[in-house]
């Protein structure tokens, strides 16, 4: 009987909530028309269609009907179909023991089941709530939003991104909240924290989505990547790479190596003094061994020497046979030490010496290896091909020279000094179209007793500046002996703007108008932009070349770690440093990277394979590789992530003291 009653109850429940039966024509007004469902409208709605064409009315009617069936207060309370008392015989319980094994005897005294949304029935004639109204026992404000652990609330201000730093985070805009909460969720659960895993689809569809800078969730920079930094001027395809893309360009590398070799060059078995004050290892830099005293009034020689104070290399200019008569003369060099300009060779010191078996004046300046003078570069001075005609200097190069010399004169004149020497043989060409004024402080010491005003000396600098440009444009060192012919040649070769600028400089001593370097720079301001743009392009090129060497230093450090760990003879008998563990993987990984052979047994020398393996090791990727021992008896399948972890743990073990390493 119990079984029959239970099955009947379940059958009634299934009929109450199951699929509706087929309705007849009398219920057609409560049935939604199929044309509305399929096409959105019914063309026979006004022509006698008996079905309902209002979907909202049908849904509301169906929901109210189902609520009456499921949440009726007159529904009978749930009671078990079979109740066993404590005094029942075992025989009567044996038939239903298996079915009732999970029901506690205390269930008989339990209160009848009622939905929480329905209040208890009272004797009062007026009910407290309407039967069809649901009062939820919880609200949205009481449900705390999921926030991942470790989420820093300090980033909420940056996530808001509206620039109002003074607005509290509880009242500011939250890009992860889908809709405003009318139940005051901020007051119910405390400060609102942004949920990075929530998506505001409604705001995205309405065009109001807010994407802030999520600095708290950014991945770390992948330093193992070779980022191609511009400019790019190669003609290879997108998938093609060559070895030169990973290192410095050959011309730049050769130039820097030659400069390094010239800096470290020594001259054994020389007759030069071994020590000049605090300098040693002197090497002569003059190409012409004939004495020339036309510029300074004394024969001068240039040497490269190394300082005993800081170990750096400097250029020493020696004035032979100079006798210092006034101590204040050499003190004038102190003002030149404060001149710091990229177009002026820096002066560091000046002193007298008898190391050359005479009385000499020594000037200490910066050393620029493999530098030439403008006379050697353009005027054929020191050229072994004496019969070859000098090449014409392009106007753009001359404008570059004028810009750099004007920059140097502006810095010198601003320091209340005068260059006094602007000669092709005393201007260094240290790079491609890169010049520096040299030997500027010498005349202040040599001609200290000659009294000339500073304004007159600065005007003379402008005249010497103009004569230098005319000399370079004519490609003749003695062209200024005939100024009229020189200017005719200069006018035919260059534009009127350059000619007018040179005329203005040559008339620098005339007092018809004010002339200084600032006025000259203002007059050539249009051409300064071209020179400045060229300097920016050179800076971009050097930055691009430098970026190629950025990752090479990282790979060297990685290979250094590998060699620190692999095959250490002092730990051969240490059980904690056995090569049967993770360090054995590193040993055969080194063979996998550097000691591969082809099918014929010949060594494989593949730089691309080495760089690829080391980059993957540094990144710790999940890619797995097969490592085979040297005797080909063991095979291991490991990932780069496991190899990186083994390398780091082994290297950290090396840094520990020997006592702690034995304990671990």
Curated annotation (Swiss-Prot):
InterPro entries: Kinase-like_dom_sf (IPR011009), PAN3 (IPR030844), Pan3_PK (IPR041332), Prot_kinase_dom (IPR000719), Znf_CCCH (IPR000571). Keywords: ATP-binding, Coiled coil, Cytoplasm, Metal-binding, mRNA processing, Nucleotide-binding, Zinc, Zinc-finger. GO terms for biological process: mRNA processing; nuclear-transcribed mRNA poly(A) tail shortening. Its main location: cytoplasm. ATP binds at residues 317, 366-373, 425-426. Residues 265-525 are annotated as: Pseudokinase domain. Residues 74-96 have a biased composition (Polar residues). Residues 1-27, 54-134 are annotated as: Disordered. GO terms for cellular component: P-body; PAN complex. Disulfide bonds: none annotated. Residues 115-131 have a biased composition (Low complexity). It is found in: Cytoplasm. Pfam families: Pan3_PK. Residues 565-664 are annotated as: Knob domain. PANTHER family: DEADENYLATION COMPLEX SUBUNIT PAN3, PAN2-PAN3 DEADENYLATION COMPLEX SUBUNIT PAN3. Homodimer. Forms a heterotrimer with a catalytic subunit pan2 to form the poly(A)-nuclease (PAN) deadenylation complex. Interacts (via PAM-2 motif) with poly(A)-binding protein pab1 (via PABC domain), conferring substrate specificity of the enzyme complex. The N-terminal zinc finger binds to poly(A) RNA. Contains a pseudokinase domain. The protein kinase domain is predicted to be catalytically inactive because some of the residues important for catalytic activity are substituted and it lacks the equivalent of the binding site for a peptide substrate. However, it has retained an ATP-binding site and ATP-binding is required for mRNA degradation, stimulating the activity of the pan2 nuclease in vitro. Belongs to the protein kinase superfamily. PAN3 family. This is PAN2-PAN3 deadenylation complex subunit PAN3. It comes from Aspergillus niger (strain ATCC MYA-4892 / CBS 513.88 / FGSC A1513). The gene is pan3.
